[in-house]
Amino acid sequence: MQREIIKAIPLLNEQGNLTQAGYAKKLLPVYDRTKVKGGAARLKEWDYYYVGNDRFGVAMTIADNSYMGLDSVSFLSFEGEPWQITKSPMRPFPMGRTGLPATSAAGVTASSGKHHALLFQVGEGKRVLTAHMENFRDAQPIDVRITLDREPEESMVICTPFDRQIGRAHV
């Protein structure tokens, strides 16, 4: 059953469960990481952007899924014979230390490794997305700098409950 969230609500209740499953077209569910039960091992946070047109697209992700961090850059070409390439270096056990902002409406998200760096800056009415990754395609690096200065009228906010059966692969 699909249910649209149309007013600001807390994302999680005091027990750490979703207050309402569904979707919103704006950032209406309010996230409070202190309500995630089970400590740092239960945090699953990421910041993802896709920017594209009819010719190409770029996707960038910084993720902290407790046991595994992921910094990803994808380039998609839609001209001629379509192709895509994705490089996703992983970081072991970041356990929340990536320091993602509590909201996607403002703040800085950053992560780097020996051969890459990603930085997402949100504030002053714009989003600046930068990425550098060595050996991206044919031993050449990729450098990305995208400035978004108009917020879309709608975005996608999805609130999906996960099965909490103890002793199962998905808790």
Residue spans for each PLM region:
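Targeting-peptide/extracellular-domain and disordered-appendage signature
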Residues: 1-168
